[in-house]
Every structure is written in C-alpha cells, then in structure tokens.
Amino acid sequence: MKGLQVAFKQTLGHVVFDIELQLPSKGVSAIFGRSGAGKTSIINVISGLTQPEQGRIALNSDVLFDSVLGINVPVHQRNIGYVFQDSRLFPHYHVEGNLKYGVKQYDAEMFDKVVALLALQPLLKRYPASLSGGEKQRVAIGRALLSSPKILLMDEPLASLDMPRKKEVLPFLEKLSESFEIPIVYVTHSLQEILRLADHLTVLDRGQIVASGVLSEVWSSQAMRPWQSFSEQSTLFNANIAEQHPQYALTRVMLSSTASLWVQKIDAPLGSDIRLQVRANDVSITLVQPQKTSIRNIIEAKVERVEKRHPAEDKESIAVKLALTQDCFLWATITPWALADLNLKQGDRVFAQIKGVSVTQRDIALTH
C-alpha cells in the first residue's frame, strides 16, 4: 500500500493513544491539536524514538514496526529525516560541516540542489553562533534533506521563531513538497502554517484522531470549531488564477468551473494553482442582486444549511452554508436578526457578497 500507515496503541503518562492513520505518499500532512494532544508522540513513534506497546508502522512497502511480526527497524536504519523545534546544530562545525554531517554518500548535485533551495550559499562558512533563528532552521532542514530520507518529520520547526523569522522561513517550506517527492509530516499548532503548507490535515485530541483527510474538508468540519473563533471561521478553496485586472491591482481566481472571485493582486502567472481562505465574517447575503455597489464579488448561491452557533454563553451567531455549484461551498456568518429578517431556509436562492479587499496575501498560498 502506498503512503504512510500508522496504527498503534500506547499509554504515555495520562494520554492513551489509539491511532489508525493513513497519510499520502507525498505532500505535506499536518498533525494539529492543542498542547499535550500527542502530536510529537506520533512522529516519535514513526521515527522509532518511541516504541509503542502494539501496532504497525509502514512506509509504502517498508514495514518499520510490527508488534505481531516482531519487526522493529532501528532508528538509524529507518531512513527518516527529522527536524526538531530547535535546530540542534553542532556549534564547532560551520554550516557546510553541519550539512554534510551524517551524509552516508556525498552527492554534489544533491548538495547544490539543497543549498540553492534553502538559499544557504552565503552561510556555508559561518558558524551556528552567528546565525539567526531562521537561518539555523534552514540549515537544520537542509541537513535532514541531505540524508536522502524516504520521509521528512518536522516537529513545530517554526515554534521557537519570532514572526519576522517565521515569515523568512515559510517560503522555503512551501517549496519543499514541490522539490522533493517524499511525504512530509508536519506537526504544528498554527492555523496560518496549515493554510500555507498543508495538503492533508489530521486533528488530534488526547491521543485520539478527531478528523483526518484532505485539508479543505477537515478545515470546514466540526473538528476545527474549537480552534476557529467567531472571527476566524472560514472556507478554504483550491483555486487557480484566471485573470489580472488591466487597470487595478486585482486578480480573478476560479473557485470552480463557473464561480470566480476578485481578490487583491497575486503576483503569479495565469493558471497558477492557489489555496485561498475566505472568512465567513466577510461574506454577506442578499435576496436580490444588488446594483451600483462597491462590493466587487456578487455570486449567486443556494442555501445548503443553516446552523446556530454559540461562541459564548451569552452570544449566538448563524452559520450559513452556501452552495456556489454542486461541489463548491462557501460559509457565511450572520446575526440571528439577519436570519429572521431574510427568513432564510434550505433551498433558497440568494446572492453572496464578498469585498475584493477582504482576501489579502495572508489568506493566499501558492500550491504549485
């Protein structure tokens, strides 16, 4: 079977793990959850740093652990790259020495590829003490890649960095899955990192899998509600760039074969695939098509579902799921007053309104 299969049972402290997980054979699979949910424990089991009481771990056709068959491949033979929260560089080696440390068979072409991908050339003769946090993490990622791993495990690699350093490293992480066709398992507690990087999402809570699947589906599921506040609820779209406005700094993206959206200008070629977030708070609903309005996006839709939500004991909001096409949906958040005034019900034809300026660069990621 292709991909990464993780199945194990284990008790660690107060957390009882019962994991059954199938992850894709390439791309970025994010593991998300609150502190103490067991995210790092899962990748430690995959790497062999932790041995479960029972279970099976397999990568494609390679069985790494099987408690029934008595298989437990040692850590150093699993051919796994691991990037920790802290870079763990050797202080007495310069960057080039750190990159080459542990490389079984030096490959000059691969070395040049990794150095170019992570923009490490200016750093090669410098020592870790002179590097910024972001530079150290880029070196750590490079070292892991140069071990020619069959899978890359990343344990919150940006958690120790401040915001400017995170912004420095994120573009390099975005290139990883395009440049190396290996599965990348990425542990994080950051919704922004998931938006920018992930193709697949697993939500974990106290050692149990709450949801796992394609990012756009899990993102809109009940499993994500505890982490999405009233203002953070949103819809994710896999879209592509269709048009650059000839006069204004706006880009039209296709959400489906017929539904499109004008957003702030995206500097990428026509046809580029992107991931795009539309916040439910930025979507309003009208029963008739407006005329002479400043809102650039007016999309005909059908009411698919109406849900009452309680972000706090004394607060209530209404989530409306709108069908733009048969398999393309958009969430809108409105007030109970608006619901009563519009008398919305399933099957109603309406118009969704989204400001062109509401979708910004932080809501968009190129997916190559």
From Swiss-Prot:
One of its GO terms (cellular component) is plasma membrane. This is Molybdenum import ATP-binding protein ModC. It is found in: Cell inner membrane. It catalyses: molybdate(out) + ATP + H2O = molybdate(in) + ADP + phosphate + H(+). The complex is composed of two ATP-binding proteins (ModC), two transmembrane proteins (ModB) and a solute-binding protein (ModA). PANTHER family: ABC TRANSPORTER I FAMILY MEMBER 10 (PTHR43514:SF4). Belongs to the ABC transporter superfamily. Molybdate importer (TC 3.A.1.8) family. Residues 292-363 form the Mop domain. Keywords: ATP-binding, Cell inner membrane, Cell membrane, Membrane, Molybdenum, Nucleotide-binding, Translocase, Transport. The keyword Membrane applies. The keyword Transport applies. Its main location: membrane. GO terms for molecular function: ABC-type molybdate transporter activity; ATP binding; ATP hydrolysis activity. Part of the ABC transporter complex ModABC involved in molybdenum import. Responsible for energy coupling to the transport system. It is an enzyme of class 7 (translocase).
